[in-house]
Swiss-Prot record:
Compartment annotation: Secreted
GO molecular function, one term: ion channel inhibitor activity
Protein name: Potassium channel toxin alpha-KTx 27.1
Signal peptide extent: 1-23
Coiled coil (residue ranges): none
Domain remarks: Has the structural arrangement of an alpha-helix connected to antiparallel beta-sheets by disulfide bonds (CS-alpha/beta).
Organism of this sequence: Buthus israelis
Lineage: Eukaryota, Metazoa, Ecdysozoa, Arthropoda, Chelicerata
GO CC annotation terms, alphabetical: extracellular region
């Protein structure tokens, strides 16, 4: 039982280290709804889903984009 628990713990620890979390980027585009952000994110080659947070579009970067702030939510 201890071996099973230890194996599970090690697997979870490795998964946390190996699988990086990506932050959303603020693309400096105003919005009212999440659907307003789909086209600007697509134009900048970002990944969906895009979100409208506090009146600003955010999306996940697929490549490094210059002049974007990294936001953590």
């Amino acid at each position: 039982m201890k071996f099973l628990f230890l194996t599970l713990f090690v697997c979870c620890f490795i998964a946390v280290l190996v699988i990086p979390s990506e932050a959303q980027i603020d693309i400096n585009v105003s919005c009212r709804y999440g659907s307003d952000c789909a086209e600007p994110c697509k134009r900048l080659k970002c990944l969906l889903p895009s979100k409208c947070i506090n009146g600003k579009c955010t999306c996940y970067p697929s490549i490094k984009i210059k002049n974007c702030k990294v936001q953590t939510y």
